[in-house]
Swiss-Prot record:
GO biological process: basement membrane assembly involved in embryonic body morphogenesis; basement membrane organization; cell-matrix adhesion; regulation of basement membrane organization
Chief localisation class: secreted
TM region(s), chain numbering: none
Cited InterPro entries: 6-blade_b-propeller_TolB-like, Cueball_EGF_LRP_Nidogen, EGF-like_Ca-bd_dom, EGF-like_dom, EGF-type_Asp/Asn_hydroxyl_site, EGF_Ca-bd_CS, EGF_dom, G2_nidogen/fibulin_G2F
Region annotation Disordered: where it falls in the sequence: 645-691
Pfam family membership, one: G2F
Protein name per its UniProtKB record: Nidogen
């Protein structure tokens, strides 16, 4: 990296070759062009100093107007952040490239912060008419511009930023720079001065939040949008503004900025004698070292120079990136695919994990048709992986060759005849260090379905250097489409063009070939997100047989072995070693001290001696044996030992110089490793005479042997005579399934993650110890899944009830379920616990859940000012002495009171009476008078927001200016078009800064029952039960065959089943006074309301399995209607005058939806297809039929007293949506179409119709006078009525029909109560943004119940 001294030397050398005539050399010296203008004490006018801070501004009212471009200005603002603006205040730093929205002059526009600077730091502005300054400025202009030989300056305005730091309050590096406006009545010139050594930082620090700051920008912006920037502006080369020049003096720049014609821009000096560069140094490091990246070195060559990235960085020298740092790629798409234009709204976003060569790319928004076909545009998949491929053997990847600036041209030819051209232009890093690309697509690809799964197997592509700066590749590929049982064959031709720079010591790469491996390819279109998601891993420099363990890319520590694993590798510690983190946080393999940990198997009469990677056992004095079994000497003397086997150590009682009891074991292992076949252990390898003759001789067996009937036999995986057993497998291996297999990395305890309450949790696969201090490994972790997913710290792919946390022992971010939930972090299920940390609702509303360390759990504790056990808290005395009451107050019998002439304000403080009402207004707020209420109040000033009592703060800039939305979010206008806010894109939820992927059945198939499928609907992705099953999708039950084609009729005290042919009528249940009823065709049950017992009950169609449904807070349920799709039961209570609803699956979830302007509600009907509810009201003065949405909103009058008299029961015709009703006053059965309000009469001149239903194109109704079930077809022709026997009273009330057809549709409320909380009931409302509303239930206490109806 070039040092300050080398830079200074380069500058001196550069200045030495500037050839100017003696006349002009003397002239430049006399002009003191590189010296800062200073305000001298006693000078005319005054100097303005900016306050310390990071967004300050002051205004200078100009004595003489100044011209800039084609405009004239009288005010000039100076801003902390290195910029001057005309007539407009511009205090905030905007992280966006030029042009800005203001007419401005930027000397060094950057995130300046002087909040904690010392006295040596200042930002000043002064206007001078001192003759010495005017003469100096005039001479400079006359010298630089040949047309200004008569120029005389009338004023010089100077702004200086001296020793300023950068955001956030950093002062370790300081910048100094100046801008001078030199003007007369018509012309204006701007001089920038950057002193030698004055530029030491380029951008502020954002602490990883949002986009990084753009590097300093220098230039001009006109009011009409024209702009001009200096060389290096907004890039790393901005640091050379103090060394470059357009005038001949390093660090000094001069421009003419007025007058400028409409089609022109600012002008640079034109004096030909000002600078002449030496041809010898035109292409040398002395002249152009600053063209290299700051982390690169410049190398001269015979002709020209090359830039080479330094250690720890990679690139082409002009652009260098830090090793292993993730990078983002952003791009746009244009063109035409399959004769359809590619949406220019579609944006490409890639996230590259460079340390792994893994790329994740998203393109959205895309229509399903376009997204499905774009999956076949393979260059979208392969180009970014080529750039950032993992290098093998030092082979350069794409970024090392190009620095991110190149052209990629592709042609795809499909076997089916289609041709496609793709041109990609990579423009290098943008202002925010994101790689920018423009993509053009023209041609056709084969048609594939959006839901078809495309499989592209791993493949190796070959690139050939045609010449330096040009690569070519031709590859034949096959894409498998399993659902369609077809294979798409295609040929991909690629050509890459870039500017190459070969050092003299580098060979010409022409005709050489490089192999790149593409693996783990994903080609998915997600319709919910309107997004194409593609991903891949890539390595460059591979061979067809290479893997990470043999190509040199693996990096394993000592005492570990490299094991190829899928497309990467893992490092497993040798047996006897365990993985631990050293003081640097690096995982190393350290010896396990089995003797200290107690994991050895030595005899209790033996001494354990730890060794590197193992341990030895030695019998203590007075005992003999192999250390794993030791007997006293007296016992051992009576035992006959078999002859010693060669290589077997004699039993000892003291450690020998070579303490290993198996001296040949290492040699045996070496021989065994050389064998191609693993030897199979022989359980009886030795002659019969070696079998022990005494049962106690089993103690002589090896620790790796068992004793069978007095015979020592080595364990599986060991070889020997039973007395000495050697391990067949080497270090890091284990005998399994008849061969040696690599030993997986041992799992060790990890630290738990604990919250502020002390509640701790463990990652998936670990269990919290009883003392909550450690997480112990209990089951295998699905590492493969983690490897295939985008890291959770990148894509926020954890479950909604999980967080993404770093676990140092695992060296990765892991999704961890939150307290109260259990799972792998991608799926978290609630667990039951009596702790308030799990169930905070058990605490009193005036209590907090606090973790008590001595109890080891959380408990409820009353808040300050309350007493009790935490479950029940009562108000405590407010005070016991004046000390408890604060300033200007005293304690009066347990109550704090204000002193005389003081009164309480809204923040409960005692303040002097008067002022603004009874309070003092905070900063940036004023006192206003509300004439309507007759009171004073504090309000924030315009441009400020917040609490006017405690102080108002300036309104922050919105995201369309700051560009600070998070990943998976966009900046969208609010209802006020002037304001913007960050909003998560479809499929994600959050505050727009952190967006978490919503859990759905596509990314979590376990949400669906095994008898359900994940379907895309207008409501999003939902689980839908398969044909023949019913349920909410997460639980599906097989539909039982139900009897059909019969009526169920209420006779008051009896419920009767009436076949449509009128025969075999039979009672199915007894009631006291059942009026309205309806059926649930899904479960084969009939529900009715009993106005005498004040209940709603149900039975099966045959009368069995009687169950209560609603038994409390119900008076007179005269009408019953069931929505079988959303699983809701509605009823009309004529005593309470309400319309209510409850969940069929959980009747405790019930709500009142209408309770206003009802007199005598009777009949009720639901249309689940069109999502409408209808009811009749027997109000004698104003009878009516009304309708509403299913949640009670949108209430409308359908029919009034002019159309109905005594409307009883209602029925909705499924096909047409008509509402039909029986009117005992008009003695008609009529129907009305709710949309156009057209009425048609089905039958008239009736007696007293009450209940009504419809099936098989026929209407059925009960008649109180004829005491029959009357029938008429849809054309109005009367049919033979049914005369059922009467089992109860002689009146028939409500009725319903059981048909074979039972609807099976989706509803937003089907699954998990539609996502509503336990205190709310989900009800369908398509007019709501989510397609549903969450109604407060009748039993909820912490839910604000809005007045239903109107």
């Amino acid at each position: 990296m070039p040092t300050f001294g080398s830079k200074l030397l380069a500058c001196l050398l550069l200045s030495s070759v500037i050839l100017v005539s003696g006349q002009f050399e003397h002239y430049l010296d006399s002009l003191r062009a590189s010296e800062l203008y200073e305000f001298e004490d006693g000078s005319l006018g005054s100097i303005h100093l900016l306050p310390k801070g990071d967004s300050e501004t002051i205004v200078l009212q100009l004595e003489q107007p100044i011209h800039f471009y084609g405009e004239q200005y009288e005010q000039l603002y100076i801003n902390t952040n290195g910029i001057l603006t005309f007539n407009s205040e511009f205090p905030e730093y905007l992280n966006q490239p030029f042009p800005l929205e203001y007419a401005s002059i930027a000397a060094f526009y950057s995130n300046v912060d002087t909040s904690f600077s010392d006295e040596g730091t200042s930002i000043s502005l002064f206007e001078s008419k001192e003759q010495s300054i005017l003469d100096r400025a005039s001479s400079l202009v006359r010298y630089a511009f040949s047309s200004q030989s008569e120029f005389e300056a009338r004023q010089v305005i100077v702004a200086t930023w001296r020793n300023v730091g950068y955001f956030d309050s950093k002062t370790d590096r300081l910048n100094t720079f100046q801008v001078a406006l030199i003007a007369n009545e018509q012309s204006t010139f701007v001089q920038f001065i950057y002193p030698d050594g004055g530029l030491n930082w380029l951008q502020g620090e954002t602490a990883g939040l949002g986009l990084p700051d753009i590097r300093a920008q220098a230039g001009f912006v006109a009011e009409d949008g024209r702009f001009y920037t200096l060389n290096g502006s907004g890039s790393e080369n901005a640091r050379f503004l103090s060394e470059s020049t357009n005038l001949g003096v390093p660090g000094v720049w001069l421009f003419e900025v007025a007058p400028i014609e409409n089609e022109q821009n600012v002008r640079s000096p034109d004096n030909a004698e000002s600078l002449t560069e030496s041809p010898a140094l035109a292409l040398s490091c002395q002249a152009h070292a600053h063209q290299c990246h700051e982390k690169a070195e410049c190398h001269d060559k015979a002709e020209g120079y090359c830039c080479v990235c330094g250690s720890g960085f990679y690139g082409n020298g002009k652009s260098c990136l830090a090793n292993d740092q993730p990078i983002r790629v952003t791009g746009t798409l244009t063109g035409e695919l399959n004769k359809q234009p590619v949406s220019e709204e579609a944006k490409l976003q890639s996230y590259v994990v460079t340390s792994e060569g893994r790329t994740y790319t998203t393109i959205n928004p895309l229509t399903p048709e376009l997204g499905a076909q774009l999956r076949l545009v393979l260059p979208l998949l392969t180009t970014v992986p080529w750039l950032f491929a993992k290098s093998v053997g030092g082979v350069a990847n794409g970024y090392q060759l190009t620095g991110g600036v190149y052209t990629h041209v592709s042609r795809l030819q499909f076997d089916s005849g289609e041709n496609l051209h793709v041109n990609q232009t990579f423009e290098g890093l943008n202002y925010w260090d994101q790689l920018s690309v423009k993509i053009e697509i023209y041609g056709e690809v084969p048609a594939v379905a959006a839901d078809a799964v495309l499989i592209l197997p791993d493949y190796v592509e070959e690139y050939t250097f045609e010449r330096p700066g040009e690569l070519k590749s031709v590859q034949v590929l096959n894409i498998n489409i399993t659902e369609e049982q077809r294979v798409l064959g295609l040929q991909v031709e690629q050509r890459i063009l870039y500017r190459s720079c070969l050092r003299d010591d580098e060979a010409d790469p022409s005709a050489t070939k490089v192999l790149q491996k593409i693996s783990k390819v994903a080609l998915d279109y997600v319709e919910r997100d309107q997004a194409l998601r593609i991903g891949a891993m890539s390595k460059v420099g591979v061979t067809p047989e290479s893997n990470a363990c043999n190509d040199g890319t693996a990096d394993c520590v000592e005492n570990s072995v490299c094991v190829p694993y899928e497309d990467t590798y893992r490092c497993d510690c040798y047996h006897g070693f365990a993985a631990q983190l050293d003081e640097r946080g690096v995982e190393v393999c350290l010896d396990i001290d089995e003797c200290a940990t107690g994991s050895h198997v030595c005899d209790e009469n033996a001494v354990c001696d730890n060794t590197e990677g193992g341990f030895n056992c030695y019998c203590t004095e007075g005992f003999e044996g192999n250390g794993y079994r030791c007997l006293s000497n007296s016992t051992a003397d009576n035992i006959e030992y078999p002859p010693a086997v060669e290589g077997q150590a004699e039993p000892t009682s003291e450690p020998s110089p070579n303490p290993s009891p198996y001296p040949d074991q290492g040699q045996d292992q070496e021989r065994e490793r050389e064998d191609d076949q693993y030897p199979q252990p022989n359980p009886y390898p030795y002659p019969e005479e070696q079998i022990p003759q005494h049962p106690d001789e089993c103690y002589r067996c090896s620790k790796d042997a068992d004793c069978y009937q007095g015979r020592c036999t080595c364990h599986e995986g060991f070889d020997g005579d039973g007395y000495t057993c050697t391990n067949i497998c080497g270090h890091g291996e284990v005998w399994e399934n008849g061969r040696c297999e690599p030993l997986l990395l041992e799992r060790h305890d990890v630290d738990p993650l604990c919250d502020a309450l002390g509640e701790c949790r463990c990652p998936y696969g670990y269990e919290l110890s009883e003392d909550s201090q450690r997480c112990t490994y209990v089951q295998e972790f699905d590492g493969e899944r983690n490897a295939d997913l985008i890291p959770c710290d990148v894509d926020e792919n954890c479950h909604i009830n999980a967080t993404c946390n770093w676990y140092g022992q695992e060296l990765r971010h892991i999704c961890t379920c939150q307290p109260g939930f259990r799972g792998d972090g991608y799926n978290c299920d609630p667990i039951s616990d009596d702790s308030c940390a799990i169930r905070p609702d058990i605490c009193d509303v005036h209590a907090d859940c606090v973790y008590e360390e001595h109890l080891g759990k959380s408990e409820c504790q009353c808040q300050a000012g309350y007493t009790g056990n935490g479950f029940n808290c009562q108000l405590a005395a407010e005070c016991q002495s004046a000390e408890h009451c604060g300033e200007n107050a005293f304690c009066d019998d347990g109550v704090c009171r204000c002193q005389a002439d003081f009164e309480r304000d809204v923040s409960d403080r005692c303040v002097p009476a008067g002022r603004c009402g009874s309070v003092f207004c905070g900063s940036n707020a004023i006192c206003k008078w509300d004439s309507a209420e007759g009171v004073q109040y504090c309000d924030c000033l315009d441009g400020y927001q917040g609490d006017a009592l405690t102080g108002c703060t300036s309104k922050p800039l919105s995201c369309h200016v700051l560009n600070n939305c998070g990943i998976h979010a966009t900046c969208e206008p609010t209802e006020d078009p002037a304001n913007y806010e960050c909003q998560c894109i479809a499929g994600f939820k959050g505050d727009g800064y952190v967006c978490i992927e919503e859990q759905n059945c596509l990314n979590n198939p376990t949400l669906c029952d095994m008898n359900a499928q994940c379907r895309s609907t207008n409501s999003g992705l939902v689980c839908v039960c398969n044909q023949g099953f019913f349920g909410n999708g997460s639980l599906c039950q097989e539909r039982q065959h139900q009897d059909s084609d019969f009526l169920i009729v209420s006779q008051g005290v009896m419920i009767a089943r009436v076949p449509l042919n009128g025969r075999n009528v039979r009672p199915i249940s007894v009631a006291q006074m059942a009026i309205g009823l309806d059926k649930d065709c899904v479960e084969g049950r009939v529900y009715w309301g009993d106005i005498s017992t004040k209940k709603i009950v149900s039975t099966k169609y045959d009368g069995t399995d009687l169950r209560p449904f609603i038994t409390t807070d119900i008076e007179s349920p005269e009408g019953i209607a069931i929505d079988v799709i959303s699983r809701r039961l509605y009823w009309a209570d004529s005593a309470k005058d309400t319309i209510e609803v409850a969940s069929l699956d959980d009747p405790s979830l019930r709500a009142v939806i209408i309770n206003k302007q009802l007199v005598n509600p009777r009949g009720i009907a639901v249309d689940p297809y069109r999502e409408k509810l209808f009811w009749s009201d027997w109000d004698r003065e104003s009878p009516k039929i009304e309708m509403s949405n299913l949640d009670g909103t949108g209430r409308e009058l359908l029919l009034g007293k002019d159309d109905v008299t005594l409307p009883n029961s209602l029925v909705v015709l499924e096909n047409s949506g008509e509402v039909c009703y029986a009117d005992a006053g008009t003695k008609k059965v009529e129907c009305i179409e709710p949309q156009n309000r057209q009425i048609r009469t089905i039958s008239n001149e009736l007696s007293y119709p009450f209940g009504i239903t419809f099936t098989h194109d026929q209407f059925y109704w009960t008649d109180w006078t004829t005491k029959k079930v009357e029938i008429v077809d849809s054309l109005g022709a009367r049919q033979t009525p049914i005369q059922p026997p009467f089992f109860g009273s002689h009146k028939m009330y409500g009725m319903t029909v059981v048909e074979q057809h039972c609807p099976q549709y989706q509803s937003p409320c089907q699954i998990s109560n539609g996502g509503c909380t336990d205190s709310r009931l989900c009800l369908v409302n398509r007019q709501a943004p989510s397609g549903k509303s969450c109604k407060c239930t009748s039993a909820s206490t912490g839910c604000t119940v809005l007045a239903p109806g109107y």
